[in-house]
């Protein structure tokens, strides 16, 4: 059996993928992968996702230069969620979020509202030309 066949893909052939920073263990982002994206990620050693809005493979960093080097690919106990242990490149500290922040999880719920807790490290207008 092919290793990709052991996974439980959803009805659209997709699976959520969490990118976690190697070393700090910060959760950087959640994206989606199809079989081809996961296969390319394993082959290339860099994160390749599937863009649901563009309906195509998304090579992380192809526009921004903020590539994710993949050190390890894990699967959860139900075999329906992927975890990538990555090094975020292209800026120090690494920028994973399209808003110019280190992580896409930069808002925290406090006292009935969402508060921004993490700074913008680079203006998104200068990231995406």
UniProtKB/Swiss-Prot annotation:
The keyword Repressor does not apply. One of its GO terms (molecular function) is phosphoribosyl-AMP cyclohydrolase activity. Its EC number is 3.5.4.19. InterPro entries: PRA-CH, PRib_AMP_CycHydrolase_dom, PRib_AMP_CycHydrolase_sf. It holds the Pfam family PRA-CH. Keywords: Amino-acid biosynthesis, Cytoplasm, Histidine biosynthesis, Hydrolase, Magnesium, Metal-binding, Zinc. Its main location: cytoplasm. Pathway: Amino-acid biosynthesis; L-histidine biosynthesis; L-histidine from 5-phospho-alpha-D-ribose 1-diphosphate: step 3/9. Homodimer. Catalyzes the hydrolysis of the adenine ring of phosphoribosyl-AMP. This is Phosphoribosyl-AMP cyclohydrolase.
